[in-house]
Design a protein with these regions (language model features):
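TOPRIM fold recognition
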Residues: 1-8, 220-221, 234-353
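Non-catalytic accessory segments of DNA primases and related replication-initiation nucleases
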Residues: 1-131, 277
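Short aromatic/hydrophobic-glycine micro-motifs
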Residues: 16-19, 137-140, 305-306
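A short acidic, often aromatic-flanked loop/helix-cap motif at beta-alpha or helix-coil junctions
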Residues: 28-32, 147-152, 313-324
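Residues that flank catalytic or metal-binding motifs in active/ligand-binding sites
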Residues: 61, 168-172, 321
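Extended, non-catalytic subsegments within catalytic or DNA/protein-binding/adaptor domains
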Residues: 73-169, 177-203
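Phosphate-handling DNA/RNA-contact segment within nucleic-acid enzymes
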Residues: 151-266
Length: 353
C-alpha cells in the first residue's frame, strides 16, 4: 500500500500518456525531486515531489518522453482551496525538495564524470566492434573495451538490488561531451554499445547538450548534426569525410545540441540530418507524430542559419525501423546516401554562397 493519496491516479495518468513502466521501474517513484528515466527502452522519464496537506501526502510534478521530442505533462491533482499559510508552507517544502534534488543531481553528475574519465582512460583506442562490423562501418572518435568490465550502481532504496551491467570485450565506448565546457570538464559520461547492439549509459549524468563530434569543424563551412552514432558515421561516408557531424544521441537532445553548435560556430551553416520516424505514433492520440522530423523541423526553424534534410527511401520493403541515413545506406547503398546529401549541399552552396 503506497503512502501517497494519489498514487494510483498518477500511475493512471502516466499510462494514459503512453508510458509503459517496466520491471526495472518497480518501486515507483524511485526518487523524489530528481529526474528518473523509465519506460520501455528508457525513453520516458518522471520527476515527482511530495506535498503534505491536511495530514495526507500527495505526489506532484510531472512526466514525459523523449519519443515525442521531449513532450511533458504535469501531474493533475484535485486540490481544495488553500489558505495563505498552507500555500506558503507548501512552497517552502517544495523549494527545500528542489534544492536537495539539485544537490543530489550535481553529486551524481560529478560521479558520472569521474567514472567516465577513468573508464575512458582504460579503454583502448584500437580494437574491433562486432556491432560496427555488422553494419560495415569503421569507428571514429571512439574507443573499445579490450577486456570485459562490470558496472555496478547502488540501489536507490534499502532492500532493492544494485544495478549490475556486464560489458564484454569488443564493447564500443563513446564519449558524451559538452563542447561548450572547459576541456577539463567537457567529458560528462560514456555510452557503451555491446557486441549484441545493446546500449548502456553511465548513470547519473545530464544528457542535454552532450554530443560527440566526428571530424574537424574549425575549417569547414558546414556543420552537420544527427541523432545516432551509426547514422553519423554513414553521413560522414556519404560526404566523403568533407564535413564534420555532431551526434546528438536522440531527437529530444537536438533542441539543446543545435543551438550549442550555433553558438560555437556562429559563421558556419548548419544542416540537421533528421531521422524519418515514419511509423512512430503518439500512444495518447494514435496519430503519426514522427518525432525525428517534427523535432528537427522546429529546431531548424528556431535556430538561425540552419537547414534540414531527412533520408528518402524508395524500396518497397522498407521496415518500420528504417528511419535514418544508416538504414538508407544498408537498404539502398552508400551511393544513394551520397547523392541525397551532396545534391542538397551543392544547392545550399548556390543559395548561400
Amino acid at each position: 500500500m503506497s503512502s501517497w493519496e494519489n498514487y494510483n491516479k498518477v500511475l493512471g495518468q502516466m499510462a494514459a500518456f503512453g508510458i509503459e513502466l517496466q520491471k526495472k521501474d518497480a518501486g515507483f517513484p524511485k526518487k523524489i525531486g530528481a529526474k528518473v528515466t523509465c519506460g520501455k527502452g528508457g525513453k520516458d522519464f518522471y520527476k515527482v515531489y511530495e506535498f503534505d496537506r491536511n495530514g495526507k501526502t500527495y505526489l506532484t510534478g510531472g512526466f514525459g518522453t523523449y519519443r515525442h521530442g521531449g513532450t511533458y505533462q504535469k501531474i493533475e491533482v484535485e486540490w481544495a482551496p488553500l489558505s495563505d499559510e498552507e500555500r506558503n508552507r507548501q512552497q517552502a517544502q517544495r523549494q527545500a525538495q528542489i534544492e536537495a534534488a539539485r544537490a543530489r543531481a550535481a553529486q551524481e553528475a560529478e560521479l558520472a564524470r569521474s567514472s567516465a574519465i577513468d573508464l575512458w582512460r582504460k579503454a583502448s583506442p584500437d580494437g574491433v566492434s562486432p556491432y560496427l562490423e555488422r553494419k560495415g562501418l569503421r569507428g571514429e572518435s571512439c574507443r573499445y573495451l579490450a577486456k570485459p568490465i562490470t558496472l555496478r550502481w547502488p540501489a536507490d532504496r534499502p532492500g532493492e538490488q544494485d544495478t549490475v551491467v556486464r560489458l564484454p570485450e569488443g564493447t564500443l565506448v563513446l564519449p558524451l561531451i559538452r563542447y561548450d565546457f572547459p576541456k577539463a570538464e567537457a567529458l560528462r559520461a560514456l555510452q557503451f554499445i555491446r557486441p549484441d547492439g545493446a546500449k548502456v549509459y553511465l548513470k547519473g549524468f545530464e544528457k542535454p547538450g552532450c554530443a560527440l563530434r566526428l571530424g574537424d569543424a574549425d575549417h569547414s563551412p558546414l556543420v552537420m548534426v544527427c541523432e545516432g552514432y551509426a547514422t553519423g558515421l554513414s553521413i560522414r561516408l556519404g560526404v566523403d569525410g568533407q564535413f564534420p557531424v555532431f551526434v546528438a544521441w536522440d531527437a529530444g537532445n537536438l533542441a539543446h545540441v543545435v543551438p550549442l553548435v550555433r553558438a560555437l560556430y556562429p559563421d558556419k551553416r548548419l544542416l540537421i540530418c533528421a531521422d524519418d520516424d515514419w511509423k512512430t505514433f503518439d500512444k495518447r492520440t494514435g496519430r503519426l507524430n514522427n518525432p525525428g522530423r517534427t523535432t528537427a523541423k522546429k529546431v531548424a526553424k528556431d535556430v538561425p542559419g540552419c537547414d534540414l534534410v531527412w533520408p528518402v527511401f524508395t524500396v518497397a520493403d522498407r521496415g518500420d525501423k528504417d528511419t535514418d541515413f544508416d538504414d538508407l545506406r544498408k537498404l539502398e547503398g552508400l551511393h544513394v546516401v551520397r547523392r541525397q546529401l551532396t545534391g542538397l549541399i551543392r544547392d545550399m552552396g548556390r543559395v548561400y554562397g
